[in-house]
């Protein structure tokens, strides 16, 4: 299964959700933001190299703690050399080899978001509480559906005690509230899923529930 993690704008915690969800699903995590990568980068080849034909996908997959990651480079030259049209084939190859793949998409409604969405079987929408953020999520959902990536789940980030039903109606998917958590917030910076730092906390249990919702969609 190829799962795209997307959102209507930056700053909603999309990369945080992607990293922690990949750990929960035992999936390969791909940083699909070719221009503004967020996930930690190792010392080997990266997605820019793969999309430029300089490396095979399996050569660029690295272990980041307990998660396998295909990171993306951060150089302008690398981004220019990469062919985004090849991304779908790369994701398909990873899924054939490893099973589940989680793609951290570029933020917002940029044109390059469409490539991983077109390759994905489903998506997780990440949003924040509040009407403006959910409205951005609606636009992200419309884009995902246009490319054939149905909504597997909605991650309502940095929320606790918020009514989920209005969000579910607006975004067309089962919503899971992820409460504020220092371990979640630091996951991308430290390259460590929250469950390795705060096992058993409300935030970790919420990520586990998000994983269950995605798995139920996969088996439906």
What residues fall within each predicted segment?
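NTP-binding/hydrolysis catalytic cores, primarily Walker-type P-loop NTPases
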Residues: 1, 191-220
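Walker A/P-loop NTP-binding active-site region of P-loop NTPases
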Residues: 2-57, 95, 100
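Short, structured coil segments at secondary-structure junctions
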Residues: 43, 65, 119-120, 147, ...
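Phosphate-binding/switch loop-helix module in NTP-utilizing enzymes
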Residues: 72-112
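Inter-motif core of Ras-like GTPase G domains
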Residues: 96-98, 107-131
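Conserved C-terminal guanine-recognition region of P-loop GTPase G domains, centered on the G4
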Residues: 135-149
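Beta-strand-loop-alpha "switch" segments that mediate conformational coupling across diverse proteins
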Residues: 158, 167-195, 213
